[in-house]
Amino acid sequence: MAGIKIIKENVDRETFEALAEICPFDAFSYENDKLEVTAACKMCKMCLKKGPEGVLILEEDEKVAIDKSLYRGITVYVDHIEGQIHPVTFELIGKARELAAVIGHPVYALLMGTNITEKADELLKYGVDKVFVYDKPELKHFVIEPYANVLEDFIEKVKPSSILVGATNVGRSLAPRVAARYRTGLTADCTILEMKENTDLVQIRPAFGGNIMAQIVTENTRPQFCTVRYKVFTAPERVNEPWGDVEMMDIEKAKLVSAIEVMEVIKKEKGIDLSEAETIVAVGRGVKCEKDLDMIHEFAEKIGATVACTRPGIEAGWFDARLQIGLSGRTVKPKLIIALGISGAVQFAAGMQNSEYIIAINSDPKAPIFNIAHCGMVGDLYEILPELLTMIEGPENNKDTETISIPEAIETPERMVV
């Protein structure tokens, strides 16, 4: 593993102060004239790039070159519950087809479970070249040991170059366990995936609190793993004439044995599913107090929308955590989302920027939300929202209200600002 070596003879307090000012993680300590790198270091390498010369050296393990030609194909893990395929699987198949086209690789789907062979035909209709099926009675319920063993067995036999996994409860448990077995890279919650011609998968996601978009590449190991949330990508159209085939796989029974026995499955009650909402009204710091949410809920009810929030709404205790949009919440892709008093930081934008139509209301004309909004209204939401409510209800229901004038819209090729 890479590490930072300190050239002790070139260290003094002035050097420490310079490094401490550069390091965003406060990962340097200086005691008894001794400089040390603490466990807080994230290997961002900022100190190596901008720190004093002759003080720090990057020590890296010797890299063993891997023959990437031995690994072929982009595999999508099929996430399902009792044969009901999670829609994130189809979205990943669409992205896998795009990536595979760059390097001329086939697209595979890995399906494991009990009595699920017939589901392979459904996967072929989305343009998969081959579906590998492990249909075993021991795989009826998701139990981590046998499922991880099956994925490992598949990798050993097929040698895929990349494996795309949905960021579901199952995917987040399975992918890291198997990636650790191969000591290979895994990037969680990717928002963008790109492919290099040398088959390196470029995995892009916000990092360091959303301040940068990190491009992560697994250069020296295979297979490459990543997880992606539901609604980040778009599912492809079904093909009229599927061309792929199905291969039934076998595995040693000993690998399907687990110390865990499922005694009973208790289905969770269906709760809030923000990711399926077609119209959303999202509120941010611009909402001053909880009482003001009454007006917002009234507006949302008028247009048939679900009310959601950014992280401050959760921290204030105003919303259920399942209603948060963003990196630490849900990813959504509604037909319409109206952002009220939301600045549009990367943490929030990453969870909704693929929405079909985005309307933003914010008092700051330079707010980042306007960079992704299709229509923006610059102004106080406490003035704009009542006017919108009046327009929706109609003048006959608001006889005491003065005539409302809405500023003329200035239209740009793709976006509109009011």
Swiss-Prot record:
What is the activity regulation entry? Activity is stimulated by divalent cations. Highest stimulation is observed with Ca(2+).
Principal location: cytoplasm
Gene Ontology annotations for the cellular component aspect, listed alphabetically: cytoplasm
- Stated pH dependence: Optimum pH is 7.0.
What stretches pass through the bilayer? Answer: none
Q: What is its EC number?
A: 1.1.1.436
Q: How does activity depend on temperature?
A: Optimum temperature is between 20 and 30 degrees Celsius.
Keywords for this protein: 4Fe-4S, Cytoplasm, FAD, Flavoprotein, Iron, Iron-sulfur, Metal-binding, NAD, Oxidoreductase
Pfam families tied to this protein: ETF, ETF_alpha
Q: Where in the cell is it found?
A: Cytoplasm
Catalytic activity, as annotated:
lactate + 2 reduced [2Fe-2S]-[ferredoxin] + 2 NAD(+) = 2 oxidized [2Fe-2S]-[ferredoxin] + pyruvate + 2 NADH
A molecular function (GO) term = 4 iron, 4 sulfur cluster binding
Cofactors? FAD; [4Fe-4S] cluster
Q: Which residues bind FAD?
A: R285, I325, G326, L327, S328, S343, G344, A345, V346, Q347, F348, N362, D380, L381
Gene Ontology biological-process entries: fatty acid beta-oxidation using acyl-CoA dehydrogenase
Q: Which domain of life is it from?
A: Bacteria
Q: How does it assemble?
A: Part of the stable heterotrimeric lactate dehydrogenase-Etf complex, which is formed by the lactate dehydrogenase LctD and the electron-transferring flavoprotein (Etf) alpha (LctC) and beta (LctB) subunits.
Record-linked PANTHER family: ELECTRON TRANSFER FLAVOPROTEIN ALPHA (PTHR43153), ELECTRON TRANSFER FLAVOPROTEIN SUBUNIT ALPHA, MITOCHONDRIAL (PTHR43153:SF1)
User: Which family does the similarity line name?
Assistant: Belongs to the ETF alpha-subunit/FixB family.
Q: So what does this one do?
A: The lactate dehydrogenase-Etf complex catalyzes the oxidation of lactate to pyruvate. It uses flavin-based electron confurcation to drive endergonic lactate oxidation with NAD(+) as oxidant at the expense of simultaneous exergonic electron flow from reduced ferredoxin to NAD(+). The electron transfer flavoprotein (Etf) mediates the electron transfer between the different donors and acceptors.
Name it.
Lactate dehydrogenase (NAD(+),ferredoxin) subunit LctC
Origin species, per record, is Acetobacterium woodii (strain ATCC 29683 / DSM 1030 / JCM 2381 / KCTC 1655 / WB1)
The beginning of the lineage is: Bacteria, Bacillati, Bacillota, Clostridia, Eubacteriales
